[in-house]
Amino acid sequence: MADRRRVHAWARARPAAPEPAPPTPSAAAPSVAPGPAATPPDPAVEQEFTRLQTQYDARLGLYAVDTGSGESVAFRADERFAFASTFKALAAAAVLDSTTPQQLDQVVRYSKDELLENSPITKDHVATGMTLRELCDAAVRFSDNTAGNLLLKHVGGPQGLDAALTAVGDEVTSADRWEPELNSAVPGDVRDTSTPRALAHDLRQFVLGDALAEDDRALLTDWLRRNTTGGTVIRAGVPADWVVGDKTGSGYYGGRNDIAVLWPPNRAPIVMAVMTSREEPRAKRADALLADAARVAVTALG
């Protein structure tokens, strides 16, 4: 039976992946495409988010949408934050969209010199290599940095990821560098940044929309639901009987992010992206802020 996967044009001709480049001055931010009309903000909800920013001494951005009712909650949802390791879920989606099941099981070889810090899975498989399927699992579920770079390399580097996101309607996210440089999160630098609204859009397209073939959606959803790094963020702020699939990210300047699809019992899914930052380069991340913000958002959505 013929494979019915849609392989986008960006995936058919992958340019050679460039080496990580040294920091350069900020580029101009890409234009933000207009989205659907937003739910009018609730002053009480905005006040609660503002209070959380003060409590945690951090900048908070959040976007959540009930895919059943269309109701949304937004707070600084169109401001830029460094996306950090959340990109790994999007890169995995791009890999899925550009491969057949047989190609997913092809072994990717890499050297010890390519290993990065925070590579708990790939560090144990240098001698044997790993399949693309295994690398996606390692990147999404364990936030393995080496796996993340290998996925980027497969789709044509940051430029290839940008093209894949543009194909699903994201003209906001700017993918520019590789792990670990993409985590620098210097205020005002638009490289490797996105917005809560844009990341929520991407995740919705890949997990709930038709951007991926059905079997690819199922794979990505499974990896997100079995993520091992998200227990203290969005998952901690929603009812225990909700199913959550998420991808976290952390960077300098206290950057801490989580993008998730939430499945409440007997309701349509909720898609949520929470992004945070602080003023000092070595500031600690505040996981509890993301959990508290998620709690406020789901309460507001009812």
From Swiss-Prot:
Asked if the record carries the keyword Secreted, the reply is: yes
Q: Where does substrate bind?
A: S143, K247, T248, G249
Amino acid composition bias (Basic residues), ranges on this chain: 1-11
Which reactions fall under this protein's catalytic activity?
A: a beta-lactam + H2O = a substituted beta-amino acid
The alphabetized list of GO BP terms reads: beta-lactam antibiotic catabolic process; response to antibiotic
The enzyme's main class, written as a single word, is hydrolase
Fetch the InterPro entries from UniProt. Beta-lactam/transpept-like, Beta-lactam_cat, Beta-lactam_class-A, Beta-lactam_class-A_AS
Keyword annotations for this protein?
Answer: Antibiotic resistance, Hydrolase, Secreted, Signal
Instruction: Report the subcellular localization.
Output: Secreted
Similarity comment: family membership: Belongs to the class-A beta-lactamase family.
What else does UniProt say about it?
A: The class A beta-lactamase family has a specific amino-acid numbering system, sometimes called Ambler or ABL numbering and often misspelt as Amber. A multiple sequence alignment was used to derive a consensus sequence and then the consensus was numbered taking into account insertions and deletions. This allows use of identical numbers, e.g. for active site residues, despite differences in protein length. UniProt always uses natural numbering of residues, hence there appear to be differences in numbering between this entry and some papers.
State what protein this is by name: Beta-lactamase
What organism does this protein naturally occur in? Amycolatopsis lactamdurans
Its lineage reads: Bacteria, Bacillati, Actinomycetota, Actinomycetes, Pseudonocardiales
Q: Which gene encodes it?
A: bla
